[in-house]
Regions:
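Conserved Class I S-adenosyl-L-methionine-dependent methyltransferase catalytic core
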Residues: 9-105
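Conserved class I S-adenosyl-L-methionine
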Residues: 103-113
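S-adenosyl-L-methionine
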Residues: 143-176
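Conserved SAM-binding loop of SAM-dependent methyltransferases across substrates and taxa
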Residues: 114-130
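Conserved SAM-binding motif I beta-strand of class I
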Residues: 133-139
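Short SAM/SAH-binding signature in class I
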Residues: 176-182
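A short, conserved alpha-helix within the catalytic core of class I
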Residues: 186-198
Length: 199
C-alpha cells in the first residue's frame, strides 16, 4: 500500500490519521452538524443574541442524554431554562479553565444531583478546550448517582466518577482544580462550601 487513512469521529471532533512511508500525520476538525442538530440550534425560544458555549448543534448527544433535547434533537420547552442556566454557568467559569495550565483539570461537583453541570463541564473542558480532565460528582442520593454513572457509561465518559456520600464526612482528593455546585437544597450549599475548604 502507498497510504492508509483512518478517519473516526469522537463526539464533536473528526480525527484523520494518514500513514505513508514518510510517517504518520494526524488532522483534527470539528464535526459538521447534522440537519437535525442545526434545526435544534435554531430554536426561536433561545436567546438569539447570545453566543452559547454548549452549542446544541455540536453537543446534541450530551444534551439528549441529560434530557435537554428530545430523541429527535429538539430542545424541550420545559428544559430551556435549565439549558440557559448551565450554559451561563459555563460562561462564568470558562476563563478560569482557559487560563489553567495544569496537565489535568480535576472538578469536584458537590451535591451533583442529576449531574447536569458535571456532564456539561466535562464536555466543555474535554471537547471544546481539548484538555484532559477528571470529574467527580458527589451526592447523598444513591439513585441519582446510579443514573449519573449509567449516563457517563452510555456517553463513553470514562473520566467521570460518581460517589454516593454525605458531604459532611466526605474527604475530597487534594488535587482538585475547582469545586463546583449548580445549586443545592437545604444545607447542601453550606456542605459544598465546607467540602471545598477541605479539598
Amino acid at each position: 500500500y502507498d497510504e492508509s487513512v483512518l478517519t473516526y469521529t469522537e463526539r464533536s471532533t473528526v480525527v484523520t490519521l494518514s500513514v505513508t512511508a514518510r510517517g504518520v500525520q494526524m488532522k483534527q476538525a470539528e464535526r459538521e452538524a447534522t440537519a437535525e442538530e442545526k434545526a435544534a440550534a435554531a430554536n426561536p425560544l433561545l436567546d438569539s443574541g447570545r453566543q452559547y458555549l454548549i452549542r446544541v448543534d455540536q453537543a446534541a448527544a450530551l444534551l439528549r442524554e441529560i434530557g435537554i433535547l428530545t430523541a429527535d434533537g429538539k430542545l424541550k420547552n420545559d428544559m430551556i431554562r435549565k439549558y440557559n442556566q448551565i450554559d451561563h454557568y459555563v460562561e462564568l467559569v470558562a476563563p478560569m479553565f482557559e487560563q489553567d495550565d495544569s496537565d489535568e483539570i480535576v472538578l469536584l461537583d458537590c451535591a451533583c444531583g442529576k449531574s447536569y453541570l458535571s456532564f456539561v463541564m466535562n464536555y466543555y473542558i474535554h471537547e471544546v478546550l481539548h484538555r484532559r480532565c477528571r470529574v467527580i460528582g458527589v451526592d447523598i442520593k444513591e439513585h441519582v448517582i446510579d443514573e449519573s454513572r449509567a449516563m457517563a457509561k452510555r456517553l463513553g465518559y470514562h473520566n467521570m466518577t460518581f460517589i454516593c456520600a454525605d458531604l459532611r464526612t466526605y474527604q475530597p482528593p487534594k488535587n482538585v482544580t475547582a469545586v463546583i455546585s449548580l445549586h443545592a437544597c437545604d444545607i447542601a450549599t453550606d456542605l459544598a462550601l465546607g467540602t471545598a475548604t477541605r479539598a
